[in-house]
């Protein structure tokens, strides 16, 4: 248990210190409970990828063009630690943080740690690109779903 806590703390700090973020694309938020029609830019930290067999851990950052208000809390960016199952094309969020400013800066206005089940990769270009980067797959050309 103690080793898991130390690993988790190390992973949290490694995703924050001098992270090199690579933009995956622009999208529009269309989630239940969140104001829709909001532009969002999604980034991943390729340098912070941690692989162990078919399992990979990678940070994802989202910047919102206007503040997102959810459960009475506003944030301009969110950072999440995702675990990917490269063999079975699944993922789960291990933890996430909401920040008062873009690029995961400013105050942390909310955070949560998850221990949920793996979910299939959503057939969405941004989520699929994240999985491919995390798992070391070559990004397919536009229009090719393989």
Named regions from a protein language model:
Residues 1-3, 19:
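Absolute protein N-terminus
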Residues 4-13:
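Sec-dependent N-terminal signal peptides
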Residues 17-146:
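N-terminal secretory-pathway/extracellular module detecting exported/lumenal segments
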């Amino acid at each position: 248990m103690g080793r898991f806590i130390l690993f988790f703390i190390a992973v949290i700090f490694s995703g924050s210190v001098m992270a090199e973020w690579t933009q995956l694309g622009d999208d529009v938020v269309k989630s239940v409970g969140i104001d829709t029609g909001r532009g969002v830019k999604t980034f991943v930290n390729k340098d912070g990828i941690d692989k162990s067999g078919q399992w990979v851990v990678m940070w994802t950052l989202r910047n919102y063009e206007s503040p997102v208000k959810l459960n009475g809390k506003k944030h301009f960016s969110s950072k999440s630690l995702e675990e990917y199952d490269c063999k079975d094309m699944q993922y789960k969020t291990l933890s996430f943080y909401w920040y008062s400013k873009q690029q995961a800066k400013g105050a942390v206005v909310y955070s949560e740690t998850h221990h949920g089940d793996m979910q299939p990769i959503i057939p969405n270009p941004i989520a699929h690109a994240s999985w491919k980067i995390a798992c070391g797959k070559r990004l397919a050309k536009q229009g090719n779903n393989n």
